[in-house]
């Protein structure tokens, strides 16, 4: 099960589980709330996300576009190898900002 949580000071959304058609609604709401409540870039911590389906990828692209329109960035942080492969196969790693180093402990 995906459990989106975020810490506003760091603009980090922590995800766990699978980002798919069943969970994308909750994640979309969390991301939109964070974007609306903050001014900085949005970081999505994917360290504990096992897989992302087409619906999840669509959400990431839509969020990327929304943050760009606001002059901000979406950063996908420390995705698991399975998610990195999906991003590479779909070539979204060329569009989305993917940071492969782990988040600092304080995040």
Predicted regions span which residues?
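STAS-like cytosolic regulatory interaction modules
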Residues: 1-51, 61-107
């Amino acid at each position: 099960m995906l459990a989106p949580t975020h810490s506003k000071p760091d603009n980090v959304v922590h995800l766990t589980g699978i980002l798919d058609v069943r969970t994308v609604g909750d994640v979309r709401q969390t991301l939109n709330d964070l974007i609306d409540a903050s001014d900085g870039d949005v970081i999505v911590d994917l360290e504990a996300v096992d897989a992302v389906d087409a619906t999840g990828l669509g959400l990431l692209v839509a969020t990327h576009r929304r943050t760009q329109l606001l002059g901000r960035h979406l950063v996908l942080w420390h995705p698991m190898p399975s998610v990195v492969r999906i991003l590479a196969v779909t070539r979204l790693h060329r569009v989305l900002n993917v940071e492969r180093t782990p988040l600092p402990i304080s995040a």
